[in-house]
């Protein structure tokens, strides 16, 4: 796991002895957004539910890997070196992505270690949102719009 300091300075842990001086430096060894990440976040909505099922061999992904909690997603992205997912634009525009409006059986009747049914339904949102997706989306958008350093992120990602 990475410390908060290492997350702030990802190049701090790069082994410089293996760097090719002719190679342009980069932060991400894999892409931060791809169809699998998008369907991961949007799996409660069609056509992304169908795409997710197709990606995972005619079933939804394992419940332990599904997007079910903003807190868990934040913890994973903040601590795992190889988790480079970014929030997709829909986080700022589509509150329905956090609700299981299609009543999908996302856990596919799987059982936990105690034999209890695993239930994955709506995404667990932070307490400040009062578990209302519209509150969550509006607050994310407000924070994005007031961020004075968004241009640095754009430069980092797109050059």
Predicted segments, located by residue:
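Long, non-catalytic protein-protein interaction scaffolds
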Residues: 1-159
């Amino acid at each position: 796991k990475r410390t908060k300091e290492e997350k702030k300075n990802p190049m701090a842990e790069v082994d410089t002895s293996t760097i090719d001086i002719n190679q342009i430096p980069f932060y991400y060894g894999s892409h931060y957004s791809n169809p699998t990440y998008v369907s991961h976040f949007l799996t409660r909505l069609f056509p992304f539910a169908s795409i997710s099922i197709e990606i995972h061999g005619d079933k939804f992904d394992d419940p332990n890997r599904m997007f079910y909690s903003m807190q868990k997603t934040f913890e994973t992205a903040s601590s795992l070196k190889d988790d480079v997912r970014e929030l997709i634009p829909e986080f700022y525009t589509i509150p329905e992505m956090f609700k299981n409006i299609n009543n999908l059986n996302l856990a596919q009747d799987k059982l936990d270690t105690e034999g209890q049914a695993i239930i994955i339904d709506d995404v667990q949102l932070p307490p400040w949102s009062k578990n209302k997706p519209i509150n969550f989306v509006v607050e994310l958008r407000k924070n994005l719009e007031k961020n004075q350093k968004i241009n640095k992120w754009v430069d980092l990602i797109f050059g």
